[in-house]
Amino acid sequence: MLKIGIIPNEDKDEELKYTRILVDSIKKCGGTAIVCDDIALKLGDKESNINEDNIVDMSDVMVCLGGDGTFLKAARMTVVKGKPLLGVNLGKLGFLADVDKNDIENAVKRLVEDKFTVDERMMLDTVIVRDGKIIAEDIVLNDVVISRGAISRILHLKTYINDAFMDLYPGDGLIISTPTGSTAYSLSAGGPLVEPDVDLIICTPICPHLLYSRSFITTADRVIKVVVAESSSHEAMVTVDGQNGYEVRGGDVIITKKSRIRMPMVRLNGKNFFDVLRGKIYDRGESMK
């Protein structure tokens, strides 16, 4: 019996409408739905005593309901346990979520019948070093964004690949992205689209004050080192997957490289990357008319 853990976003799932559909579908198909006690109580189950911290350990597969932000948050919970994650899209775009909210029942049936594949997505490890000491470290599915702080001043970032100086970027910052993250902030900043099953690292400047500055791509075995120039007297920010933020200052070093951990993502629909890309971008354009 397949045990399916559920991570809902209550802000996007009003009155837990789609979470209810998901739980009912799992039971109908002969699986076991696992939710934390707070959610279970709102669904009418007064006997559940499952702590949120234990859901991943108790599950074979995880399902989250929300947008890409919800998926990224859930991924941080599941990847360390090696559990595959499926996203149900309740947001507007949802590049990471594979299932439409109106197709939940069919998706559950495919899960229970073992009719799915698992993509192993490349991730990044990033550390922040100050005065020779690591002050923060994190794992990345989409991107690391080094950006100016609240004060609107140019940020100067010295960028190295394997300790070889690459360039000095004056501007609003720099995005270091995985192929999975190529459809996110990097794309908005003019970065390239990359198929998610390719292992490489993308670096995209944010509003660079240069005539020649463009994104660049390097192989996944390289180490990207970014030094916040000492002349940057104001603080800057390092944001990881839009989830965690760290303040940095002049002289701090951000080191990013390929992680040994890969993110297992459930795939059901069989569409290739370009089919999904065309559909998502086109649908959003149509909805804005």
UniProtKB/Swiss-Prot annotation:
Reaction(s) the record says it catalyses: NAD(+) + ATP = ADP + NADP(+) + H(+)
Enzyme type, top EC level: transferase
Known EC number: 2.7.1.23
Gene3D superfamilies: Probable inorganic polyphosphate/atp-NAD kinase, domain 1, Probable inorganic polyphosphate/atp-NAD kinase, domain 2
Cross-referenced Pfam families: NAD_kinase, NAD_kinase_C
GO biological process, alphabetically ordered: NAD metabolic process; NADP biosynthetic process
Top-rank taxon: Bacteria
Protein's recorded name: NAD kinase
Species of the source: Acetivibrio thermocellus (strain ATCC 27405 / DSM 1237 / JCM 9322 / NBRC 103400 / NCIMB 10682 / NRRL B-4536 / VPI 7372)
